[in-house]
């Protein structure tokens, strides 16, 4: 069974960055600003992204499941679907759309998390189990997830908090090596990235990439900077 995203991260020769195609942020509003999302996708590919992330949630992030399908057809990079997944039907739909990985939020799924992880893996999906505290990490470590993501921001506040990589610095050392460790959110530039990648295997970056006038140049700098 091919777990494309976790394998790509483990094999990465440069900094492993999952680049998020983020069209809207509850904090900053419209991030696309009239640009063609597929041109941004190509920029991410050229700059050396290890994978692509996309939020399908329509309510808070103005995403769409149909766009996820198109995205998976348009790129050979592994695609991570982010959403507030709460049903196994949504896991199945993720696999059917052609995504490589699915986000599973510990706070949302609680004791059902191990079952959801196993179900997703049976469907060939990498699982990125998201945590925001030591208590949530304890639950995540009871699963056979391929990846654990530390969300530096609080999803309960819908990214309206600032967030920084100090949570990654605190939690990542507690995660065994069998899991791929991903630092998510709150990474604004190279200094944040260096701090995150001292402890994590990869970083997921969205808002900072979408806000820059030249996503390709900025991402290339992040991929190539010495950490």
Swiss-Prot record:
Organism for this UniProt entry: Thermococcus kodakarensis (strain ATCC BAA-918 / JCM 12380 / KOD1)
SUPFAM superfamilies (UniProt xref): Ribulose-phoshate binding barrel
Main EC class the enzyme belongs to: lyase
Lineage: Archaea, Methanobacteriati, Methanobacteriota, Thermococci, Thermococcales
Record-given protein name: Indole-3-glycerol phosphate synthase
Listed pathway(s): Amino-acid biosynthesis; L-tryptophan biosynthesis; L-tryptophan from chorismate: step 4/5
Pfam families in the record: IGPS
EC number(s) from the headed UniProt entry: 4.1.1.48
Family: Belongs to the TrpC family.
């Amino acid at each position: 069974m091919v777990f494309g995203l976790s394998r790509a991260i483990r094999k990465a020769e440069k900094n492993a960055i999952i680049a998020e195609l983020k069209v809207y942020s509850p904090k900053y509003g419209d991030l696309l600003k009239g640009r063609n999302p597929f041109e941004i996708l190509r920029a991410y590919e050229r700059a050396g992204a290890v994978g692509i992330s996309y939020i399908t949630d329509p309510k808070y992030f103005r995403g769409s499941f149909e766009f996820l399908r198109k995205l998976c057809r348009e790129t050979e990079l592994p695609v991570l679907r982010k959403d507030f997944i709460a049903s196994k039907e949504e896991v199945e739909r993720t696999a059917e759309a052609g995504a490589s990985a699915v986000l599973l939020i510990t706070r949302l799924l609680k004791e059902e998390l191990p079952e959801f992880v196993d179900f997703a893996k049976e469907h060939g999906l990498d699982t990125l189990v998201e945590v925001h505290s030591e208590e949530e990490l304890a639950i995540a470590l009871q699963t056979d997830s391929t990846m654990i993501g530390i969300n530096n921001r609080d999803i309960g506040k819908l990214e309206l908090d600032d967030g920084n990589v100090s949570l990654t610095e605190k939690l990542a050392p507690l995660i065994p090596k069998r899991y791929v460790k991903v630092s998510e959110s709150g990474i604004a530039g190279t200094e944040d990235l260096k701090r995150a990648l001292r402890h994590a295997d990869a970083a997921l970056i969205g808002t900072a990439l979408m806000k820059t006038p030249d996503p390709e140049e900025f991402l290339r700098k992040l991929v190539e900077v010495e950490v």
